[in-house]
Structure formats: C-alpha cells, structure tokens
C-alpha cells in the first residue's frame, strides 16, 4: 500500500512539473514604423493585444514614427533579449536586411507584417501587396473614367520614402505613366493636425489642377472629409481612392467623400503574424506568406465599418 502511494505521489509530482513547462509563456516583440496617433495603428495594436490575451504570451510593442534607426535598434534589442519571436514592419526598403540575418543566425523567428521587403530573408510575410494595391488604385480611376491623359493626380503620404508609399507609387506609375497621367507625392507627416493643415494648404493652392487624389496612407485618406470641408470641396467633386482601414475612411466612403477604400485586415494581420512567429518558435516553419486586402466601395463599406466599430 505504501509503495503504491509512493508511486501515485511520484506520478503526481512528475505531472505537476511537466504541466507548467508545457504552458510556459513566451515573449514576443511587435514593432511598427507607424505612430500611436495614427488611427489605423490602434487596430493593428489591438490585434497584437488580443493575441497576447488569448495565448497568455507576453507581447512587447513599440512604435517608431518613421524613424528607421530607432526601429533598427528596437529589432536588435529584441534579438539581444533572446525573444521567442519578432514581428516587425519594414520601415524603409532594404533597411532590415542585415538585422533579419542577425535574427535568423540567432534562431529567432522574425515575421514581416504590413509592409513587405522581399530583399530581407524574413520567415514569412503577413499583409497586403503594396505594388498591386497601387496598381489597382490607379486602374480604378482609369477604368471608372475618373482620370484621362493629361490629368494630374495628387498623392499625399505620411512618410515620403517609407516602404509602403514607395511600393504603392511603383504600382501607380506602371498604370499612369503609359497613359500620360502625371502626379505628385507630398509629405503629410504622422501628426493628425499637421496632416490636415498641410493637405488643406496644398488643395487650396492646387484645387484647379487636381483631378483625383490617391491617399497613400490611412491617416491621409481618413482626413479627406475634414480637408474637403475646410477647402469647400463637395463630396464626389474630386475622386478619391486609397487606404481604408479606419472608421474615418469607412464613413467617408459611405458619405461619398471617398470613392473606394483599401482594406488590409489590421487586427487580423497582427494576430496572424504573431501566430506564425509562435508556430515557428515551436519548431514548425511557416513556409508561406499570408496576403490580405480588399477594395471596397459604398455598397460594402458598412461591413468594414462594423468590424472597426466592434459591432
């Protein structure tokens, strides 16, 4: 009887020591080139926080407001801290190539999300194809008869030179250049008030020649209504297409200020990126990318409006 009791107690002790080890929380890093004041990034961040809550793992998050050096330092700090996995955007084409090599050499999974960089050897990418998005936006304006040869298109962006805008412009140029449609990219910054001020100033000075607008980022596209109202532009007077990952833009589409918005599943993008990092940390290599995105107009904008409002 005593021997049997010892066996039972020993088995219980083994079980108690094994269970915590199996359920031990991991530490991941979620690193963004964006800024906390940008409404769309609150949704990307929400996805990361939800993942942490659902899995019980720790997710250290940071925003770098377009500061490439700061983001590079953050990724290297995560490597030095022996993170279980890293998820990061690409702040500038080629800027993380060497750092990704460092992560891979340290056997730390590093997943790229939101802004792709094919030059860097990430374990996987989760997000949209920005070149294709840009091409679709330009083609949308052409196919709908909203721009033609000789027209001028204004393309505001938060951070000129950042990966997302550079790739989107590449796609846009492939459509517009052969058709003789010209455009200008202008800086709007990541500060909401400054975005509106700069956009109002530009449109006030150039309203007569602007035949269409492509918002290369969520903050600029989500500011269209406020800019139009201040300048005296009526909804639909100037065609607009661009990013649509915020309630500001879904409402602009529903009310006719923006013709079409690009959805990228911001919450799901972060959630899936962290899931892939976790999977890789457990020894299962992803071996694939996850591409998101859908262009919506007024007839389907309510779907995305409800998602973003949590309904």
Label each residue range with its predicted role.
Residues 61-63, 117-142, 185, 255-267:
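Short beta-strand elements at the ligand-binding edges of bilobed clamshell
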Residues 71, 126-152, 194-196, 245-249, ...:
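Hydrophobic alpha-helical segments within soluble ligand-binding/sensing domains
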Residues 76, 84-105, 172, 184, ...:
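Hydrophobic alpha-helical
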């Amino acid at each position: 009887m005593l021997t049997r009791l010892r066996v039972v107690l020993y088995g219980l002790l083994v079980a108690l020591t094994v269970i915590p080890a199996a359920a031990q929380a991991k530490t991941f890093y979620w690193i963004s080139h964006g800024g906390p004041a940008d409404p769309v990034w609150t949704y990307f961040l929400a996805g990361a926080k939800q993942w942490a809550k659902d899995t019980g793992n720790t997710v250290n998050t940071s925003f770098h407001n377009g500061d490439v050096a700061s983001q590079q330092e953050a990724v290297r700090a995560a490597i030095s801290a022996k993170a279980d996995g890293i998820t990061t955007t690409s702040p500038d084409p080629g800027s993380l190539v060497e750092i990704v090599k460092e992560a891979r050499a340290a056997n730390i999974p590093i997943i790229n999300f939101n802004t792709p960089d094919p030059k860097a050897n990430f374990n996987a990418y989760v997000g949209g194809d920005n070149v294709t998005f840009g091409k679709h936006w330009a083609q949308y304006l052409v196919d709908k008869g909203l721009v033609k040869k000789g027209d001028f298109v204004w393309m505001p962006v938060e951070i000129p030179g950042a990966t997302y805008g550079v790739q989107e412009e590449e796609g846009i140029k492939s459509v517009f250049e052969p058709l003789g449609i010209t455009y200008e990219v202008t800086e709007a910054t990541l500060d909401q008030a400054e975005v509106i001020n700069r956009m109002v100033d530009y449109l006030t000075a150039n309203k007569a020649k602007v035949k269409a607008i492509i918002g290369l980022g969520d903050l600029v596209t989500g500011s269209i209504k406020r800019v139009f109202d201040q300048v005296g532009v009526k909804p639909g007077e100037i065609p607009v297409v661009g990013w649509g990952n915020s309630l500001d833009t879904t409402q602009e589409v529903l009310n006719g200020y923006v013709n079409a918005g690009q959805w990228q599943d911001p919450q799901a993008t972060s959630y899936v990126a962290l899931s892939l990092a976790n999977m890789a940390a457990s020894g299962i290599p992803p071996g694939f990318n996850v591409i998101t995105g859908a262009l919506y107009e007024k007839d389907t904008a309510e779907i995305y409006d409800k998602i973003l409002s949590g309904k």
